[in-house]
C-alpha cells in the first residue's frame, strides 16, 4: 500500500476518463476512497482504517533506548519523536528499527518526527523495501499524525512536511484517516512489455 501512489493513481485515472473525480480504488490493503480537487490541484485518499496502534514502548537501537510508537495505516509504521529530525542518521537508525526483532518477521517502516506545533510536523521516513530514506511517505505521514494525535501532541488535522519538502495534510477521524496533497501529471508515455521480454 502506497498512500502517495494511491493519490497519483487517482489523479491519472480521473485525467484519463477512467474514473470520476470521486471514486473507490481497490488495493491489497483494502478499499480506498479517493477524490480529486481539480481547482486546488490536490488529491485526497481515505486510507484503510488505522489499526494495531501501540504507544510508548521501548526499543533498544544500537545500545540506546528510544521510546517508540506504532500504527498500521495499510502498512506497518513505527514512529519515534525527536527534538531535531535533521540531525538524525536516518539510514542507520531506520535500518535498526526496520529489522528490530520486535517487528520480525515482516519488519516495519521507520518514521522520525519533530513536532513543530499543534498542527505542524516534520517527517523523515526509512522505508522497508527501499531500505533507505524516502522523501515523501504518505502512509508514514498518516501513521505519524495518528500517533501524535493519540499522544495529545497535535490536533486531528495537521500538516506534515516531508524531507523532500512535500506538504501533506492528514486528518484523523476515529480510526478513519485521510491523506491530502498536491498531485500533477509530469510525464506520459507508452510501455511495451515486449521490449522487456514480457
Task: Give short role names for the model-derived ranges.
Residues 1-136, 143-198:
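Active-site proximal loop and beta-alpha junction motif in alpha/beta enzyme cores
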Amino acid at each position: 500500500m502506497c498512500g502517495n501512489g494511491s493519490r497519483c493513481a487517482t489523479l491519472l485515472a480521473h485525467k484519463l476518463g477512467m474514473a470520476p473525480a470521486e471514486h473507490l480504488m481497490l488495493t491489497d490493503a483494502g478499499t480506498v476512497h479517493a477524490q480529486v480537487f481539480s481547482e486546488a490541484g490536490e488529491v485526497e485518499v481515505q486510507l484503510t482504517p488505522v489499526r494495531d496502534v501501540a504507544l510508548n514502548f521501548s526499543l533498544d537501537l544500537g545500545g540506546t533506548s528510544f521510546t517508540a510508537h506504532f500504527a498500521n495505516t495499510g502498512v506497518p509504521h513505527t514512529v519515534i519523536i525527536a527534538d531535531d529530525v535533521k540531525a538524525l542518521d536516518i539510514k542507520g537508525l531506520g535500518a535498526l528499527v526496520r529489522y528490530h526483532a520486535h517487528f520480525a518477521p515482516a519488519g516495519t517502516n521507520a518514521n522520525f518526527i519533530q513536532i513543530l506545533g499543534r498542527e505542524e510536523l516534520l517527517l523523515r521516513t526509512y522505508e522497508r523495501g527501499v531500505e533507505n530514506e524516502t522523501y515523501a511517505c504518505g502512509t508514514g505521514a498518516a501513521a505519524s499524525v495518528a500517533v501524535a494525535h493519540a499522544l495529545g501532541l497535535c490536533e486531528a488535522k495537521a500538516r506534515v512536511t516531508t524531507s523532500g519538502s512535500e506538504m501533506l495534510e492528514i486528518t484523523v477521524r476515529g480510526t478513519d484517516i485521510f491523506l491530502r496533497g498536491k498531485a500533477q501529471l509530469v510525464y506520459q508515455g507508452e510501455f511495451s512489455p515486449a521490449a522487456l521480454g514480457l
